[in-house]
Design a protein with these regions (language model features):
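Phosphate/diphosphate-binding glycine-rich loops and adjacent basic-rich segments that engage nucleotide
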Residues: 131-139
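Feature captures the catalytic cores and cofactor-binding loops of soluble hydro-lyases/lyases
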Residues: 3-12, 19-132
Length: 139
């Protein structure tokens, strides 16, 4: 098992298969709330489901309403269990993650997206501003 330190944004712990995207993701328009399926123009993950995954993306694109879409994914049971980004996430996404109890980590000390593939089992833990990413193996 490999451990990587990261900056913690939203506290919590979760584990699941990684869903790795090469583009920025917006919960406002890129993800279908009713199904959790990625429907936006994201070629690396188009038609994949975010449900139960640890999302690993370069960054998030948000808007004033993005928090509501992430929270609605949670209410429908179609939410990711955690989010890891290369850079700080959009504030609206952070707001939605707080409401939905989805841990967020950013700025990992090692580039996670280049290290693992979609489907690899990943666990995260965030306490305060400290985060740990544990790469557990294939899911």
């Amino acid at each position: 098992m490999k451990e990587i330190a990261a900056r913690g944004i939203v506290e919590g712990a979760a584990a699941g298969p990684a869903l790795i995207g090469d583009e920025a993701i917006s919960f406002l328009g890129d993800v279908d709330i009713a199904t959790g399926q990625i429907v936006g123009d994201l070629p690396s993950v188009r038609n994949a489901s975010v449900r139960g995954t640890v999302l690993i993306f370069p960054y998030t694109r948000g808007s004033a309403g993005a928090w509501r879409f992430l929270y609605q994914l949670y209410k429908h049971g179609n939410h990711p269990v955690a989010i890891i980004t290369d850079s700080a996430p959009d504030p609206s996404v952070v707001q939605g993650a707080i409401l939905a109890k989805i841990p967020i980590l950013c700025e990992p000390t090692t580039a996670v997206r280049g290290l693992i593939a979609t489907g690899t089992r990943v666990a995260v833990e965030v306490t305060g501003d400290k985060g740990v990413i544990r790469i557990e193996g294939t899911g």
